[in-house]
Amino acid sequence: MIKCTRRIDFDAGHRIIGHKNKCQFLHGHHYVLEITIAANKTDKLGMVIDFGLIKNLAKKWIDANFDHNLILHQDDKEIGKQIENYTGQKIYYMRNNPTAENIAIHLKNEIFPKLFIDQNFFVTSLKLYETQNCFVEV
């Protein structure tokens, strides 16, 4: 199996409903996402994937939905609607708390399979860094 990894940076805010410490409040992170894609063999050009394709598909989705935006739990729509009305931005809502773990699972299991449909490769893992020192891997 041959693996290729592409890094994508983005800035986003979130809060964790029910958290007992400061993460219960709106705050932001400079996230770094590492997408690892694998295939059993290379294509006729000798590649698993053109890194530009990852950028064009994954980064485009990240930029449109997460970058410089708020990622909130769907139960946080009251505060989200107030922010949307005030700023005009479209908040991204998730079914679960927008922890690094849940964001990575959401991207790997729900978003990226749709973006990379009908390809000869698959996403094997995602690493999502919430800080320089803390990341999750799915």
UniProtKB/Swiss-Prot annotation:
Signal peptide: none annotated. It catalyses: 7,8-dihydroneopterin 3'-triphosphate + H2O = 6-carboxy-5,6,7,8-tetrahydropterin + triphosphate + acetaldehyde + 2 H(+). InterPro entries: 6-PTP_synth/QueD, 6-PTP_synth/QueD_sf. Belongs to the PTPS family. QueD subfamily. It comes from Rickettsia typhi (strain ATCC VR-144 / Wilmington). GO terms for biological process: queuosine biosynthetic process. This is 6-carboxy-5,6,7,8-tetrahydropterin synthase. Its cofactor is Zn(2+). Binds 1 zinc ion per subunit.
